């Protein structure tokens, strides 16, 4: 065999061996990834519900003067044009005034608690040593046949921490409250004449 022929045969041997190794590697790689199974969970999301409350005065069976906490900062509003104590500034012994208000869960989640708190009672027109109208008027609050507050003075109500109202309160559910203020007929102390009081009522819905 000539040197030329030897070189030619040797020249084919190496490429053939490299090709064989490449083929084996290819087969091995194909075997490792031959079967796969995959699940993609799409649309995974989360969010927050909304708890808001509206207040209305009920006049002739219809809600009026409606205000909603969604309009206020931090979901809180102050309502002054629905006078829970009736606004009668010329009461005499034996007079009574009832105001009906309605609260509605206007949010997207059920409320787990509903509470009522009374603020300080402030009086004007009182001279030193005179009886305060805060200690003379009587307040009653009823809802759904249940008496929440029974003939208590504004002063006593301020000292009561929290009145719990039946809950839960579902979305779009409403609760009506009758608030009655009475100046007892037995009042004979004329020092309360010409006095006016003011007291905040705070209604809180929680979830």
Cite the ranges covered by each PLM segment:
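Long, small/polar-residue-biased beta-strand-and-loop interaction regions
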Residues: 2-207
């Amino acid at each position: 065999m000539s040197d030329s022929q030897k070189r030619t045969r040797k020249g084919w041997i190496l490429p053939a061996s490299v090709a064989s190794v490449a083929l084996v590697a290819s087969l091995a790689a194909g075997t490792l990834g031959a079967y796969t199974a995959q699940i993609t969970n799409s649309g995974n999301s989360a969010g927050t519900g909304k708890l808001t409350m509206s207040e209305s005065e009920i006049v002739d069976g219809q809600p009026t003067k409606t205000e909603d906490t969604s309009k206020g900062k931090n979901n809180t509003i102050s309502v002054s044009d629905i006078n829970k104590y009736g606004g009668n500034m010329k009461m005499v012994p034996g007079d009574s005034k009832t105001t009906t208000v309605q609260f509605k869960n206007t949010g997207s989640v059920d409320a787990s608690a509903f509470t009522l708190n009374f603020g300080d009672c402030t009086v004007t027109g009182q001279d030193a040593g005179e009886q305060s109208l805060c200690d003379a008027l009587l307040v009653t609050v009823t809802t759904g046949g249940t008496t929440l507050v029974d003939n208590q003075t504004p002063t006593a109500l301020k000292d009561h921490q929290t009145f719990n109202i039946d809950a839960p309160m579902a979305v779009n559910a409403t609760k009506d409250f009758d608030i009655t203020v009475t100046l007892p007929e037995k009042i004979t102390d004329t020092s309360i004449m010409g006095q006016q009081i003011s007291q905040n009522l705070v209604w809180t819905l929680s979830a």
